[in-house]
Amino acid sequence: RLTAACDKLAKAPIYVDDTGSITMMEIRSKARRLKQKHPDLGLIIVDYLQLMTSGVSAENRVQEVSQISRSLKVLARDLDVPIIALSQLSRAVEQRHDKRPILSDLRESGSLEQDADIVVFIYRDEYYEAESDQQGLAEVHVAKHRNGPTDTVKLSFLRRYAKFADLAAA
């Protein structure tokens, strides 16, 4: 099964660019070339936003992250391709008793919250509390959904595989 899965992945149209300190201009250029070459491009993932630079002068890092956020939104519209942009959280979450992330915890910019159509957080109590009675459980919280409802879904977290599964299936 492992060989079959590896073979399937090897043949999948997945393109990885692990360029360090990439600028927004470089991402835009590479994404446009990829879209021209593969018109059915289905998704772009940025891991993670704070590792990027805007390539444009900004007064501070908050403004720079705001420029990156807006530029990714424009790129998604221009290419008609969804973009998932991962983001760090601020340290504020560590200072609260309830460690579940909230929108204001998005690091270095309120514009991330503003620009995003959907914001999803993952929370695992056992990450913060070793003796938690929530071992093997995760919460996926849709904190913002511009065109739909927000809610929290509980999933099973299979640490051994770094995999999430329906509670009923686990």
Q: Where in the sequence are the language-model features?
A:
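Cytosolic-facing regulatory segments adjacent to core modules
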Residues: 1-40, 54, 153-156
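Conserved ATPase-coupling elements of RecA-like P-loop NTPase cores
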Residues: 53-60
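Phosphate-binding/switch region of NTP-binding enzymes
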Residues: 63-165, 170
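Catalytic P-loop NTPase motifs of RecA-like helicase/translocase cores
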Residues: 52-53, 69
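Conserved Walker B
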Residues: 49
